[in-house]
């Protein structure tokens, strides 16, 4: 099956910027990605990394300065109404008319499509009836997010772009949105979302592109990204017994050693095999008896922080 979205070597400049003597600023540096039907493809990165700009170029909302974008086989910039009808978009700020109420708005949006989605089902599923009589301007951020998601699905799209879909949601609404996204993926939709929340990316994604400062610095499935080279270890904490007169060694800043009770110590922050080797060597020299090792799997947040830190050092 062909990818629904293919981006190759995407470049984007903004400007001219008065603070930079009228120069242009490059914000996307050769981004390449693809998104498949029946998958959630996530652009993960900090605020300002270039995720939303990439999404805007992918939708054809802004022109690129280089590279190519193919959305359902077409160039999305200046796309035909036929292509637009196959794509749903949820913007980070909602983009909703403030004076309208949610349900009339959703029915109005659905009226533009030949194959509208199940608006009543979306209203029920996303709990929009709870605030149906309130104008958009008076809704909370999370309520606006739910309306924006329903609007993105109003045309029964094949591809859905979701920019920070869980922003402002309470835990219950967040779970409802996550469940809906998973069902849409299982139904064969291509879902492309952005997030700066590592937990969201880890829970939802089939494939992740990590974006940092306009560069695609890593990509893969969550399992691939969290898999480790042999130099890494998933130790989270170590507790051990020793003499109360133990002289503590100098440790790297990321390691935190404390005496919880006399003769009983806890070390937090062990990250690498080198950390663990230094620790075991010290135990051997001091005849220290380890008591317990607490292990945890690597998370996407660990991977993101390490990759971003390496990128910053490289720059």
Language model features: what each stretch is:
Residues 44-46:
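The feature captures the beta-strand-to-loop junction immediately N-terminal to the Walker
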Residues 107, 111, 116-131:
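Conserved ABC ATPase "signature" region
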Residues 59:
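Helix-to-loop junction immediately C-terminal to a conserved catalytic motif
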